[in-house]
Amino acid sequence: MTRHFGALIPSTNTTCEIEYSHLLPPEYQAHYGRMMSSSPTKSPFSSPLDADLDYQAKLLGTAKVEMVMLVQTSASLHSAGYDAEVTKRMEAASGVAALTSATAITRAIKALKAKKVALVSPY
C-alpha cells in the first residue's frame, strides 16, 4: 500500500523533489506544494512564503495525503513559537496532521536517544 504525504517547499527549491524521489522507500510518495519565494539569496524565510502556506497546505489536503510537512529548516528561525503556530495552521488548512523540519528532527533525535548528532549541510 502506498502512503502519501505532502511537502511544502519554497518555489526556488529545485532539489527537494529529486532528493526525495531517491531517498524514499517505494511505498512512500511525496506530493509538493510550492510557496512563493522572491529570491533564493534573500532572507531564508519571508512573508511571501508564509502568505502561501495556508493555501498550499489546503491544496495538499485535497490530494488525500496522510500528513503535511513544511520542508524548510530556516522557518524555525522565522520567529519564536513559529513552529507550533505554523503546524496548527497547516493542520487546519489541510485537515491532516502536520510537521515542520525542526520538529521532525527533534522527534527523531529523541526517538533514537541520540547523545551526539552530526550535521552535514550544503549551507
Located regions from the model:
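Gly/Ser/Thr-rich loops at beta-strand to alpha-helix junctions
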Residues: 9-14, 72-80, 122-123
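N-terminal glycine-rich anion-binding loop in soluble enzyme alpha/beta folds
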Residues: 1-55
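An alpha-beta-alpha
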Residues: 115-123
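Glycine/small-residue-rich loop that forms an oxyanion/phosphate-binding "nest" at active or ligand-binding sites
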Residues: 57-103
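Hydrophobic alpha-helical segments within soluble ligand-binding/sensing domains
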Residues: 52-54, 98-113
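Proline-centered loop/turn at the N-terminus of a beta-strand
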Residues: 29, 96-98, 116
